A protein has these predicted regions:
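Conserved N-terminal phosphate-binding loop of PLP-dependent enzymes in the Aspartate aminotransferase
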Residues: 1-388
Length: 388
């Protein structure tokens, strides 16, 4: 059997895969099993921050792999302590809990928020307000946090204690807070799976003010938009707010599984021994790779992300067959007149890999994609959208 046949025979049917078997890659180029080359504008869904087989990242993880690959959290290791220090220094947060994915990072954020509320106001203050059209993960609790019924219907009953407000509707958010005994407000500043839709400045700042007034924790889910993808280190930094908790993953590990929950001053000591844990969380190899990523997310790199974003937006806005371009930094959604599936398929045939988010083409290129490759990929997408 070939690889697709092996996959369909032995792997659970949870993914609708594209008809491409990725064999190898280098930077923003990937080759399939037939040696056809593609420009990668998806990066494993915003994971490969510096593309495939990035030399500095490979050196970091290989050196650590040949030293200690795993020790458990019963002992100290250097990479996780150093990574936590760097994350706190770059964000102003105080403590970090490491896990293996965005869903796990969000689980930790939810647990920390509920424990803080129980400790300070009582266990009945457990409701977390999230936004409609949000996506926070696929565990039974992060599904409950996700404000999209399409993900809920097969898995009832979900974890209780979540309510949903309309995104960018501050009055509705206030109404939901008033109607429940709340622990926190949780949001993605750019709703990724919901269609790459940024929240407005007015709404985010209003939500932060509301949280402060009501003694609620503010949780920012930075799983997809975080780690430089927005053009700042984290997306919330575009809004001039300071969350109490930040969850992130994807691009932080650069290709290895790593989640992080950053805890601000108010909640830095809320998690105590035995209250949470993860066997693999803070794995030294994953953290070594993340250190390589995070050290390079500096001013010049972030400026280049913003410049590349401006290029894409300018090139596609108003182009034939393009209805709108939304998003932030190098996390963009392109609403097309043609069906999204057709656009993705035709781009693939022409050697460009893009993915979808609801009714949009989603663009998630490597942060360091060369301009020549970016220009070529955008040119292909423009032609496909125009039906040329």
């Amino acid at each position: 059997m070939n690889i697709p046949q092996l996959d369909s025979t032995y792997i659970a049917n949870t993914y609708a895969r594209f008809p491409v078997t990725i064999a190898r890659g280098k930077g923003s180029l990937v080759w399939d099993a037939d040696d056809k080359v593609y420009i990668d504008m998806a990066t494993g869904i915003a994971v490969n921050s510096f593309g495939i087989a990035d030399p500095a990242w490979i050196r970091a993880v290989t050196e650590q792999l040949c030293t200690v690959q795993h020790a458990s959290n019963l002992y100290y290791t250097a990479p996780d302590a150093q990574l936590a220090q760097l994350l706190c220094e770059k964000t102003g947060m105080k403590k970090v809990f490491f896990s293996n994915s965005g869903a796990e990072a969000n689980e930790c954020a939810i647990k920390a928020a509920r424990k803080y509320a129980a400790d300070h106001k009582g266990p009945e203050y457990h409701t977390i307000i999230t936004l409609k059209n949000s996506f926070h993960g696929r565990t039974i609790t992060t599904l409950a946090a996700t404000g999209q019924d399409v993900f809920h219907h097969d898995f009832l009953p979900l974890t209780e204690g979540f309510a949903y407000a309309e995104a960018n509707n501050l009055d509705d958010l206030k109404a939901q807070v008033a109607a429940h005994k709340c622990a926190a407000i949780m949001m993605e500043v750019v709703q990724g799976e919901g269609g790459v839709i940024p929240l407005t400045q007015e709404f985010v700042k209003g939500a932060a003010q509301l949280a402060a007034e009501q003694d609620l924790l503010l949780i920012c889910d930075e799983v997809q938009i975080g780690n430089g993808r927005s053009g700042k280190l984290y997306g919330y930094m575009h809004y001039g707010i300071t969350p109490d908790i930040v969850s992130t993953a994807k691009g932080l590990g650069g290709g290895l599984p790593l989640g992080a929950t950053l805890l601000g001053e108010k909640v830095q000591d809320v998690l105590t021994p035995g209250s949470h844990g993860s066997t693999f969380g803070g794995n030294p190899v994953c953290c070594a790779g993340a250190l390589s990523i995070l050290h390079r997310l500096d001013g010049p790199l972030l400026q280049s992300v913003r410049e590349k974003s401006d290029f894409i937006v300018k090139a596609l806005t108003g182009a034939k067959g393009v209805r709108s371009v939304t998003g932030l930094g190098l996390m963009l959604g392109v609403e097309t007149e043609r069906p999204v599936k057709d656009v993705i398929s035709e781009c693939m045939a022409r050697g460009v890999l893009v993915i979808s988010a609801k009714n949009k083409v989603r663009l998630l290129p490597a942060l360091n994609i060369p301009m020549a490759q970016l220009e070529q990929a955008v040119s292909v997408l423009k032609d496909v959208c125009a039906g040329e």
